[in-house]
Amino acid sequence: SVGFKAGVKEYKLTYYTPEYQTKDTDILAAFRVTPQPGVPPEEAGAAVAAESSTGTWTTVWTDGLTSLDRYKGRCYRIERVVGEKDQYIAYVAYPLDLFEEGSVTNMFTSIVGNVFGFKALRALRLEDLRIPPAYVKTFQGPPHGIQVERDKLNKYGRPLLGCTIKPKLGLSAKNYGRAVYECLRGGLDFTKDDENVNSQPFMRWRDRFLFCAEALFKAQVETGEIKGHYLNATAGTCEEMIKRAVFARELGVPIVMHDYLTGGFTANTSLAHYCRDNGLLLHIHRAMHAVIDRQKNHGIHFRVLAKALRMSGGDHIHSGTVVGKLEGERDITLGFVDLLRDDFVEQDRSRGIYFTQDWVSLPGVLPVASGGIHVWHMPALTEIFGDDSVLQFGGGTLGHPWGNAPGAVANRVALEACVKARNEGRDLAREGNEIIREASKWSPELAAACEVWKEIVFNFAAVDVLDK
């Protein structure tokens, strides 16, 4: 006899354990599971737990060489999704020993690796993760965090203002630098490389870095304010990425940028460590996120990608606007904005938060609202996101009829007016338009911007909404 019973047995016999009491050190996951017809939810939930931890499709004799009870993932609860006839939320607990310390890459390889192609499931979505303090403590997290960034920039009591330079591709380095100067001179705190600006034939990275550094130092001297431009260090190799970050540091600029999903978590974490060691802020763009998070029944919810970024490291991340051209429902967006900024967030299913999360003082990340926003949105953005945010107007700055600098002036005046009104106790949600109109009486730049964008709306319902 070989000493073990060969063959295939149902996952639920080993991996479905409704009596399990979760531990403080477990990583907890909430999966939205859509089983194939005829597959019971317990078997589907157990299959997810098995395939994302120790299981394989058949019994193997090497199972006897380890303690499966110590290492296996466990599906400990299953809930039916309200309003859906074949969807369930399966809760899975993973022992901490399954994961390498300080590695988002390894965590995701286990939890969202092969299991998403599993035949017994029609669809699978990771809705949320609870990262235990014991695991959080193995990560550096954001290079600096919100308070250190404010201290570096000497900017307090208001959201920060940014602008993505457009057209995103095709400008020469000198013309690009000119646009950066005009926007910063007009009153913005930051300008930004677009996510797909790396080092193309029309504008090599080194030329762009030099002209942008010249632009921001000139604007800094003339305004007396600290300025920044997000220099995109994303590259084809990690070595090249770090080389670009080193050059940015040598120029003396305050901030660089990375596309964390296309660049990858390993590269991102390396860059975040470099940025902390060398005093650079790190702006994160989420290019490719909607491929992963847009579908309601399959993929990974952005709140999980946001948590992963806070662990991997970044001082800013794009988070949707609620009011602009890109996807984002208000309660869901504010749920993951709190997960980015706050030290402790309570479970709140009305905002899509499945687990209480304690970040044990890991630095916070500034959410960046960007995409199809303009001066009329300023009161809503100020009210929704509060002071600890970056409001980024690309077309809403560069599309101003009088040019880039007046576009920047219009946005700065609108922001200052909204912050002043809020501090005086006015209701931005109700009086927003009136506040902007009042401010435009003494700012011709704002008046012109108000006229151009008064009719622009993006009336599409969000795809990713809460279960009712």
Curated annotation (Swiss-Prot):
**Location of this chain's protein in the cell:** Plastid, Chloroplast
Q: What is its EC number?
A: 4.1.1.39
Cofactor(s) recorded for this entry are: Mg(2+)
Q: Which residues carry this modification: N6,N6,N6-trimethyllysine?
A: 5
Q: Which GO terms describe its molecular function?
A: magnesium ion binding; monooxygenase activity; ribulose-bisphosphate carboxylase activity
What's a BP term from Gene Ontology annotated to this protein?
reductive pentose-phosphate cycle
Record: residues binding Mg(2+): 192, 194-195
> How does this chain assemble?
Heterohexadecamer of 8 large chains and 8 small chains; disulfide-linked. The disulfide link is formed within the large subunit homodimers.
Q: What else is known?
A: The basic functional RuBisCO is composed of a large chain homodimer in a 'head-to-tail' conformation. In form I RuBisCO this homodimer is arranged in a barrel-like tetramer with the small subunits forming a tetrameric 'cap' on each end of the 'barrel'.
The protein here is known as: Ribulose bisphosphate carboxylase large chain
Question: Species name for this entry?
Answer: Datura stramonium (Jimsonweed)
